[in-house]
């Protein structure tokens, strides 16, 4: 298969544990773009304006006719000037309902609104992570989101390093999420909420259609549950070697490399350059 587009998750997939693109990934991404004309699309749960250093590292920042999938698929933007191609945000009242639930259940809460990140009840571990990622955000402790009324809401998420605890919340939230909210998990610490039907997979399909690339000629690379829809949608699904077992099980290929060793580089070598790995 002649693959034309690679959509890759960022955290724990393209990026190493220092939140950087490793040399091996940069080398093979640049080679594939330059020699084979492969499109590289960052597909992230973060906001498109929060990944400029990463886009810069792979030569895609502020480039025309290059695109980013962000907020788990709520937004598709052209990298040049952040031109919005697609937007499917979360209703404010639904976000507020989920927030109120989270306040009562001992979680840190992230809200993405108007291209900004607001973080409620941050804990020490999450503060260190956000600082390491160099994410600009506003911290708050007042258990109210009234100050966000009128803002465009992308998504909301809960943070707790006990993923079993996060998953135990899902049945308690069934009445408020069923039929209207897409729930996913990422980074072994986040429980994420988007509008129903919004995910990286639907966004990949929208973008591939815009670019007149058959979905069969796309590769998706990821490590966690919020990548599942994208991995299922793509023509070829690649799991990071450090990915969760459920994700590996549904993929066509799992890299030998982990995110510190060049997951994306290995996928390019094997499926674009057809090297024996």
How would you label these PLM feature ranges?
Residues 58, 64, 72, 176-179, ...:
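Short, structured coil segments at secondary-structure junctions
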Residues 101, 105-221:
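Conserved acidic, metal-coordinating active-site core of Asp-based
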Residues 1-5, 23, 192-277:
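Mg2+-dependent phosphoryl-transfer enzymes with acidic/Ser/Thr/Gly-rich catalytic loops
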Residues 47, 72, 115, 189, ...:
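A generic "binding-loop/recognition-motif" signal
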Residues 2-19:
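Asp-based phosphoryl-transfer active-site loop
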Residues 51-55, 169, 173, 231, ...:
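Hydrophobic packing residues within well-ordered alpha-helices of enzyme cores
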Residues 25-126:
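Active-site phosphate-binding/coordination module
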């Amino acid at each position: 298969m002649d693959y034309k587009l690679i959509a890759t998750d960022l955290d724990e997939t393209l990026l190493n544990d220092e939140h950087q693109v490793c040399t091996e990934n940069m080398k093979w991404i640049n080679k594939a773009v330059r020699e084979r004309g492969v499109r590289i699309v960052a597909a992230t749960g973060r906001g498109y304006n929060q990944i400029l250093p990463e886009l810069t590292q792979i030569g895609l920042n502020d480039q025309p006719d290059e695109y980013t999938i962000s907020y788990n698929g709520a937004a598709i933007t052209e990298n040049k000037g952040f031109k919005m191609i697609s937007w499917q945000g979360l209703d404010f009242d639904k976000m507020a309902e989920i927030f109120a639930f989270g306040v009562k259940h001992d979680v840190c809460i992230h809200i993405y609104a108007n291209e900004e990140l607001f973080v409620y009840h941050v804990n020490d571990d999450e503060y260190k992570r956000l600082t390491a990622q160099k994410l600009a955000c506003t911290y708050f402790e007042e258990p109210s989101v009234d100050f966000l009324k009128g803002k465009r809401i992308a998504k909301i998420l809960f943070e707790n390093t006990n993923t079993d605890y996060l998953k135990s919340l899902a049945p308690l939230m069934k009445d408020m999420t069923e039929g209207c909210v897409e729930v996913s998990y990422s980074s072994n610490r986040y429980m994420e909420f988007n509008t129903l039907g919004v995910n990286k997979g639907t966004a990949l399909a929208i973008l591939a259609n815009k670019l007149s690339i058959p979905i069969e000629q796309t590769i998706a690379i990821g490590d966690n549950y919020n990548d599942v829809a994208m991995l299922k949608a793509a023509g070829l699904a690649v799991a990071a070697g450090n990915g969760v077992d459920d994700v590996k099980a549904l993929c066509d290929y799992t890299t030998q490399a982990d995110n510190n060793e060049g997951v994306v580089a290995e996928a390019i070598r094997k499926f674009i350059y057809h090297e024996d790995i």
